[in-house]
Curated annotation (Swiss-Prot):
Species name: Campylobacter jejuni (strain RM1221)
Name of the top EC class for this enzyme: transferase
MF (Gene Ontology): holo-[acyl-carrier-protein] synthase activity; magnesium ion binding
Protein name: Holo-[acyl-carrier-protein] synthase
Subcellular location: Cytoplasm
Length: 115
């Protein structure tokens, strides 16, 4: 099992989004993922989730794992769900994933575990 974690100030993501708008969103979120955004906290949570997912692989966001190799969605209970691209799943021999996102006191944090 491998674990990745990321924490980000919600205000930091909010400022970047205010400055760059949809161009910022398009750099790391698919159109389906953009629908999940309800407020700056959820946007920061999505950023943290993708960063944590890349760190769980031990590589971070780079040429081996782009933001678009990681898909965030919701399950039937509205809990966050993580799916890697087929390439990542195969290259890193991933059989299971788990994602948790939380927001509090101006920060968003995400933790990812992969097996």
């Amino acid at each position: 099992m491998r674990v990745g974690c990321d924490i980000i100030a919600i205000s930091r993501i909010e400022k970047i989004h205010s400055r760059h708008g949809k161009n910022f969103l398009d750099k790391f979120l698919s159109p389906k993922e953009q629908i999940l955004i309800k407020n700056p906290a959820t946007l920061a949570g999505l950023w943290a989730a993708k960063e944590a997912a890349s760190k769980a692989l031990g590589v971070g966001i780079c040429e081996l794992c782009s933001f678009f190799d990681i898909e965030i969605s919701k399950d039937e209970k509205n809990a966050p769900k993580l799916k890697y691209s087929q390439k990542i799943t195969k290259d890193f021999n991933i059989t299971q994933t788990s994602l948790s996102i939380s927001h509090d006191n101006g920060f968003a944090i995400a933790i990812v575990a992969v097996v």
